[in-house]
Amino acid sequence: MLARSRFILVLVVGALLAVLSFSLQYLHLIPTNPVAEQRSAGRSRKRVNPVLHTDPPAPDPIRDTHQYCNYPNLTEHGWEGHCPPDYKLLSVQVMIRHGDRFPLYSIPKTKKPTIDCILSEKRKPSHPLLASFISHMALGGRGHWDASLGSLPRLPSHSTCEMGELTQTGVVRQLKNGDHLRQAYISRHNLLAADWLPRQLWAETTGKSRTLQSGLAFLFGFLPHFDWSRLTVRQQWSTLFCGQSCDCPARNRYLDQEQRRQYRQRIADAELERTYVTMAKTLGVATKTLRAANPVDALLCHFCHGLPFPCSSTQTSSNAPDEGACLTLEHFAVIRRQQKDDELERREAGLYRRYAVLAAHPYLNRSAARLERIARGSQMRKSKEDAVFALASAHDVTMAPLLSALGLEGAGFPKFAARLVFELWSSPETKERRSDRKLDNMFIRVLYNGEDLTFDTAFCREHNRRSTQPLCPLGNFLSFVRKDMFSVVNATSYQQACHQTVL
């Protein structure tokens, strides 16, 4: 009897479930054939992850400024010295921007930032080579100095920094950069032997103490305790490093046009104008006076050194100044935002690129000629005939047009202690290559702050990286420097481009 009751109960429950299932299907509350519906959605049953289309993050002027400061406590990384196996490093040409410096301008009615420019290994930031670097600079009289460089101080020397003076932060950053390239080129590739010859090292700088001192700090990191008697430091009289080829009227006209574009862009920026008015009112000066003082230069120094932004020095109270009488991070962010906007507009306008091609050509031409001599000397088994390592210690106004001329406008404005590197490599020679004097086995790499940008350059953007030769042929660079780069200004040579009419 009990078993019969259980059987009847099971039948009733089963019937109820059947009716419920039929009802749901009839009312389309569940799919009748989920597998078939899945198949009808597409031929492939492979799971496809959804692609989220999100807008790129908005530019952050404060984050970008941290990168510009180039703090020396950041670990140095880079792809310098990396190449396929069996390739040989023949030469390295480096341009650096000077390191962190004291402002070139002062903001009216504010106190200058208090920064000690006398070097001390006991003060941060420091470096294991700093103490020996200080001692080694005292022996600089044994070196060979071009023009007026011998009279410049080889170390920063003021307890309160002077205008434009290199800071200890700048020195330490250059020591680190030089040490990084020492590991990449000397430890790994033996680019310069311990008994290197004077003609194998080329060093040049402008007549500013900050570029001379930056170059010496970099060299000491690269060649610790180098022999002064083997070093000659040459002076470039122009910040463009144009040597004997500085006469270029068209270049100056392009620069005038670009500066007028910059001015129009600034005065059209309503937020920037309101910010200048507010800053001027805060300090009690005329707006045009504040704008002429280029306040971003001094504010960058405060920001990079973690100092409070300047306040009006006309406070009557000896206590801390009122917050309303001080410049703020918000003021600074607006100015930096406008500078980033200007970089984008400058790229679109194209005027700066034309100026840059003519400004950078003399330096690029000398570098190209040096690399070609070294390449041909290597083919003819003539070694140690030219500078296998060349250093140019320069300014932002030197490096910025160089980047633009190379087609690297997206690389950004040169930060403190920025470095631009040209590497010359040779691949293993075949029997066919040994019989001719072509440069088919010579290649170039271009690196900016450690990042390989070779295939972003104008002369190697179209090179097939998946070809039998994964590097950029040196011939591409030589052709670019000697002719192709002038297509931007509708010319075929430097002389023609410099003396044509600019409307």
Curated annotation (Swiss-Prot):
Spans traversing the lipid bilayer: 7-27
Location of region: Disordered: 38-63
CC annotations in GO: Golgi apparatus; Golgi membrane
Lumenal side: 28-503
GO molecular function: phosphatase activity
Keywords: Glycoprotein, Golgi apparatus, Hydrolase, Membrane, Signal-anchor, Transmembrane, Transmembrane helix
Topological domain ranges for the Cytoplasmic compartment: 1-6
Location in the cell: Golgi apparatus membrane
EC category name: hydrolase
SUPFAM superfamilies recorded: Phosphoglycerate mutase-like (SSF53254)
Membrane topology type: Single-pass type II membrane protein
Enzyme Commission designation: 3.1.3.-
Main location group: Golgi
Entry keyword Protein biosynthesis: no
Cross-referenced PROSITE patterns: HIS_ACID_PHOSPHAT_1
Record-level GO BP terms: chondroitin sulfate proteoglycan biosynthetic process; glycosaminoglycan biosynthetic process; positive regulation of heparan sulfate proteoglycan biosynthetic process
Cross-referenced InterPro entries: Acid_Pase_AS, His_Pase_clade-2, His_PPase_superfam, Histidine_acid_phosphatase
Keyword Transcription: no
Active-site residues annotated for this sequence: H98, D396
PANTHER family per record: 2-PHOSPHOXYLOSE PHOSPHATASE 1, ACID PHOSPHATASE-RELATED
Similarity remark: Belongs to the histidine acid phosphatase family.
Role summary: Responsible for the 2-O-dephosphorylation of xylose in the glycosaminoglycan-protein linkage region of proteoglycans thereby regulating the amount of mature glycosaminoglycan (GAG) chains. Sulfated glycosaminoglycans (GAGs), including heparan sulfate and chondroitin sulfate, are synthesized on the so-called common GAG-protein linkage region (GlcUAbeta1-3Galbeta1-3Galbeta1-4Xylbeta1-O-Ser) of core proteins, which is formed by the stepwise addition of monosaccharide residues by the respective specific glycosyltransferases.
Record-given protein name: 2-phosphoxylose phosphatase 1
Species per Swiss-Prot/TrEMBL record: Danio rerio
Gene that this polypeptide is encoded by: pxylp1
